[in-house]
Amino acid sequence: MFPKWFDKWNADNPTNIFGPAILIGVLGVAVFGAAAIVSIGNPAQTASMQTGPRGTGMHVAEFNVTRFAPDPTIEEYYTEAPYIPEGGEELAKDIYENVQVLGDLTDDNFNRVMTAMTQWIAPEEGCVYCHGEGDLETYGEDNLYTKVVARRMIQMTQNINENWDGHVNANAEVGVNCYTCHRGEHVPSEIWFNITPVTEATAGWASVQNRATPLSQSTSLPSNALEIYLTEYEAVNVHDLESRVAGVPNDVEVASIQKTEMTFSLMNYFSNSLGVNCVFCHNSRAFYDPGQHTPQWATALLGRQMVIEMNQEYLIPLEDEYPEDRLGPVYADAPKAACKTCHKGYQKPMQGLNVIADWPELATTEAPVYE
């Protein structure tokens, strides 16, 4: 078909035509795909929430698929309007034995709250999850750890709603109740335990980082940030305006590189817990300056203080009440809370659903106010 000289030349000079053909094919598909996206639209469209002045990178980008998707746990949320007392009704503390919290409620409202708690925490087991298999005469006994823990969690919930209004109701009345964390589960998701050191072959700082763990958000950052910053009132600030700082790292006034990495680990955890980026709270031009932060920074600061109090005053002291299978895998420590325990990846838990409107009994440590 071809001249002999042409066939001989091809035989003497073999050329791989498949490589260029594949390259041209890939480039052609890429050009076609780009043209289709421009003409039809990006299938993974995003929207940006502006958090500061234009042109400064102050925005939080979200995929519309995520932004418009409802929190699937909202559909299962149980609520019931309170029964307005008419006055003169017998109170729960006078009817039942060993009612240490919620004793000032009427019988109807007391049982209404108890019913809700079973739906929020143990919908399959119901009352027996805390009170056991006995009859009503045995409900006053504290034989099960679940009842002892539930009592303390009611007190914690009341404290949060009453004393941390600046965080839980920062933008509107939202509040918290048992379902905010539990979402129908016996044990809330996104609790955490101490796990450091994460290696046995090293000691010192190397033993708490460079291992992907849930507490490091699967990064090489330190895994002890929650342990340091969410159980103790340790200062988080590590920024210094000096290029060279006189002093010895780990002195009170001198932050070490390790502490800086712990801060990054904590901030990364914050971002993942709320599904946001750094400039949701910080100003892109001056991360270090509270005077230039967004309003969300103050809300987050209060949230951190609130979580520390929750862990110190309510959760960690319950360690002796839990059975072995409820304690941490490394140190047998009590389960602890953090931002994601409530937020579950959303800026607002349950996307801002008001979960306290029907439950004034959980909004205060005093007698509830019915409206």
UniProtKB/Swiss-Prot annotation:
Keywords of the record: Electron transport, Heme, Iron, Membrane, Metal-binding, Photosynthesis, Reaction center, Repeat, Transport
Positions of heme 2 binding: M153, C178, C181, H182
Any Pfam family matching the protein: CytoC_RC
Main location: membrane
Keyword Transmembrane: no
Residues at which heme 1 binds: M114, C127, C130, H131
GO cellular component: plasma membrane light-harvesting complex; plasma membrane-derived chromatophore membrane
Subcellular location: Cellular chromatophore membrane
Molecular-function GO terms, alphabetical: electron transfer activity; heme binding; iron ion binding
Primary role: The reaction center of purple bacteria contains a tightly bound cytochrome molecule which re-reduces the photo oxidized primary electron donor.
Full protein name: Photosynthetic reaction center cytochrome c subunit
Species this protein is from: Roseobacter denitrificans (strain ATCC 33942 / OCh 114)
Species lineage: Bacteria, Pseudomonadati, Pseudomonadota, Alphaproteobacteria, Rhodobacterales
